[in-house]
């Protein structure tokens, strides 16, 4: 229920529980949308920068909304939704997001010279270390791998998500010159740690 409240910004969801002696009512409303969702997921962590990066875009009837931030954590937290339905196994929207994120973040780290100075090869896992992301797409006629809708398989979604993320993240990098340097240092550090662990 909380996920739905975050995904539908400013919509109040009311849950009435009359089972006990004292009836309970819970009202959920979040004005910040998925950006507030990322902050909620990252409570207790130290973000690399604030507020989270957020992007909205659409193409061919498919709308994409994403919010993401990196923290001092070493784990990736990725939540994907299609028409407010969660996909625990990701799918084409996740594939498009990861491709764009890896290309943009690692491209910046390479072009800034940080990766070359440290002499490390960057991977997608390095770019996603410490990442918390909520990705929500609205698709007119989505196709899923099963009735449980755990994985989106609509092939037209991948290039749309890839394009939106590439454009918006690239634009964010240009408008915020300090944050990409901090992020690149974290990515290179993750790559160096991965290489050291492999050699050990």
Where are these regions (language model features)?
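GHKL-family ATPase ATP-binding module
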Residues: 2-200
